[in-house]
Swiss-Prot record:
Residues 561-643 form the S1 motif domain. The gene is rnb. Keywords: Cytoplasm, Exonuclease, Hydrolase, Nuclease, RNA-binding. It catalyses: Exonucleolytic cleavage in the 3'- to 5'-direction to yield nucleoside 5'-phosphates. InterPro entries: CSD, NA-bd_OB-fold, RNase_B_OB_dom, RNase_II, RNase_II/R, RNase_II/R_CS, RNase_II/RNase_R, RNR_Ribonuclease. This is Exoribonuclease 2. It is found in: Cytoplasm. It comes from the Bacteria.
Length: 644
């Protein structure tokens, strides 16, 4: 009798529209209950029975109930699930399988089965890729997943690599395909095989993509030819190899090994500028005046060269610093190293005065055994030989940026606009409280940004620099020329790593069009989106593998008195994040480890400080001694404790 009653339907509709609702993201806790976080200020309690309908990270709409002054949320509608495709560890066997997602806040096993056509018999401990198929808020009785890919078995030593690559849906190996002969590009190549070109790289590098030749000119000026490997001499635009490189966008460098953008025959052999092998190159000839300015007579041209020596960073640095027993194999090579060091000195001074120079941070290198075990992690400081190559590459990229801008008006540019204009006033106010006065308008210009950076670099500590980092915008890849505030340059376009960056291959093709006097097509904006996304995924993969290896490396230090110097990198309500100075590992120090009485402790992300009883006890950039309290292998997290 009530079935089609319009009054009843109207009443239901009314009740529904009058019931308060909220949209937000579910945050799970270890204790079974959770919270619906609507924004930074507002959250609602979700009781344990209701949490069974949702998963940490789900975006949902919930009905808000009020009982005795207490509000709680009842999940009603799924807006966006947190899990769609994920990696995890399989439990059970054959017909009764479940998968536990590999995520610090997802502990529950999700029932699952293998997808049709997946020929693997899953067993306990296997790693797999899964996709969610059912969700209680979609009208299903429970969560349910389908296993779509077998990754590896549980005890595989290389789990960190295979699981991470599967998680980010990245390739595991080099692309297939081989280039058998060079293309006829209609380019006249200068024969520079008689010149003493050298490469400077790590001892283990196989994909050498830059060689250098320097010459002193009579008037005190210096000339540099930067010769870059020429993969576009082998790979035609739109070919199968080109399409594969376009998707990968970059070589993916992970601790212990890399997954190249191009087939290894090209990256490590045909294109690699090996010593005593004749190779085609794209080259740039530039002249530096006595103060390091790049003169206007920049020349791009195609050539063939033969590198006369594969030099190694540390050996070159030792020789220039008069230490070690390595010697250049001939006076001609020694003269090249001396001239390149002069160019580096000049360009370094020019950039210091007219642009910006990054502070030197060490690179951390994992030394791995046969089974992927971490034998050691070494900090490799950036020395004079690293700076020689860096200055040569930056100069070459400035040249490409100018030529592409002036001749074509487009290219693949690295653009960084400094501070977000919306943050300019807040930035000026923050700096003022620390005694630095800047004009909110001026700081948005390249000159104003550089002026501020130089003032910050002159500060006794990096504390203020760390405070303003959050006001900066991100670097972007653009087809339009634009400034790079971070480098302090009017324009910057890379072309010096075409073996490992697809954007550099595009710039090679554009520069070749300029050399031949031909018209060129502007690259499509979609390619910059793909490159930015791939760069993000590759960085996340490198970080994930690193976290896993750091946890393995430090596991036996947990609970011991071994001390580590650690720099505070971030402070949040829950505690501090620190970076171990000797090996680069990130560890977390929970607030209770800083001071036992919670009411006397204030951890402020806003101020970058920890106060105890009103006194500043710690601040970002401080270096403190810590011990390792615990290493949680299942979440690859390292918990540290300050040394009292």
């Amino acid at each position: 009798m009530f079935q089609d009653n319009p009054l009843l339907a109207q009443l239901k509709q009314q009740l529904h529209s009058q019931t308060p609702r909220a949209e937000g993201v579910v945050k799970a806790t270890e204790k079974g209950f959770g919270f619906l976080e609507v924004d930074a200020q507002k959250s609602y309690f979700i009781p344990p029975p209701q949490m069974k309908k949702v998963m940490h990270g789900d975006r949902i709409i919930a009905v808000i109930h009020s009982e005795k002054e207490r509000e709680s949320a009842e999940p009603e509608e799924l807006v966006e699930p947190f899990l769609t495709r994920f990696v995890g560890k399989v439990q059970g066997k054959n017909d009764r399988l479940a998968i536990v997602p590999d995520h610090p806040l997802l502990k529950d096993a999700i029932p699952c089965r293998a997808a049709r056509g997946l020929n693997h018999e899953f067993k306990e401990g296997d790693w797999a890729v899964a996709e969610m198929r059912r969700h209680p808020l979609k009208g299903d009785r429970s969560f349910y997943a389908e296993l779509t890919q077998y990754i590896t078995f549980g005890d595989d030593h290389f789990v960190p690599w295979w699981v991470t690559l599967a998680r980010h849906n990245l390739e595991k190996e080099a692309p297939d395909g081989v280039a058998t002969e060079m293309l006829d590009e209609g380019l006249v190549r200068e024969d520079l095989t008689a010149l003493d070109f050298v490469t400077i790289d790590s001892a283990s590098t196989e994909d050498m993509d830059d060689a250098l030749f320097a010459k002193a000119l009579p008037d005190g000026k210096l000339q540099l030819i930067v010769a870059i490997a020429d993969p576009t001499a082998w790979i035609a635009e739109g070919s199968k190899l080109d399409k594969a490189a376009k998707i990968r966008a970059f070589t993916n460098y992970l601790p212990g090994f890399n997954i190249p953008m191009l087939p290894r025959e090209l990256s490590d052999d045909l294109c690699s500028l090996r010593a005593n092998e004749v190779r085609p190159v794209l080259a740039c000839r530039m002249t530096f005046s006595t103060d390091g300015t790049i003169e206007d007579n920049i020349e791009f041209f195609a050539a063939t060269i033969e590198s006369k020596a594969k030099l190694v960073y540390d050996q070159v640095s030792d020789w220039l610093e008069n230490t070690g027993d390595w010697q250049p194999e001939s006076e001609a090579i020694a003269e090249q190293v001396r001239l390149l060091a002069q160019i580096c000195q000049r360009r370094g001074e020019w950039r210091h005065n007219h642009a910006l120079v990054f502070k030197d941070r060490p690179d951390y290198r994992f030394i791995l055994g046969e089974k992927g075990e971490v034998l050691d992690i070494v900090a490799e400081p950036r020395r004079i030989a690293n700076r020689i190559v860096e200055e040569a590459m930056i100069a070459a990229n400035i040249c490409a940026a100018r030529v592409l801008r002036d001749k074509l008006g487009f290219g693949i540019y690295n653009v960084h606009m400094g501070f977000d204009p919306a943050n300019a006033d807040a930035l000026a106010a923050l700096l003022k409280t620390h005694g630095l006065h800047v004009d909110a308008e001026e700081v948005l210009t390249l000159d104003g940004f550089c002026k501020l950076r130089r003032e910050l670099d002159a500060q006794p500590t990096g504390f203020l620099d760390s405070r303003i980092r959050r006001f900066q915008s991100f670097a972007e890849i653009s087809t339009e020329p634009g400034p790079h505030f971070g480098l302090g340059l009017e324009a910057y376009a890379t072309w010096t790593s075409p073996i490992r960056k697809y954007g550099d291959m595009i710039n090679h093709r554009l520069l070749k069009a300029v050399i031949k006097g031909e018209t060129a097509t502007r690259p499509q904006d979609e390619i910059t989106v793909q490159m930015a996304e791939r760069r993000r995924l590759n960085r996340m993969a490198e970080r994930d593998v690193g976290d896993w290896l750091y946890a393995r490396f430090l596991k036996d230090k947990a609970g011991t008195d071994t001390r580590f110097a650690a720099e505070i990198v971030d402070i949040s309500r829950g505690g501090m994040r620190v970076r171990l100075v000797d090996n680069g590992a990130i560890a977390f120090i929970p607030a209770p480890f800083l001071h036992a009485v919670r009411d006397e402790l204030v951890c402020s992300q806003e101020n970058g400080t920890v106060q105890i009883k009103g006194e500043t006890a710690y601040k970002v950039t401080d270096v403190i001694d810590v011990t390792i309290a615990e290493v949680r292998m299942e979440t690859r997290s390292i918990i540290a404790r300050p040394v009292a």
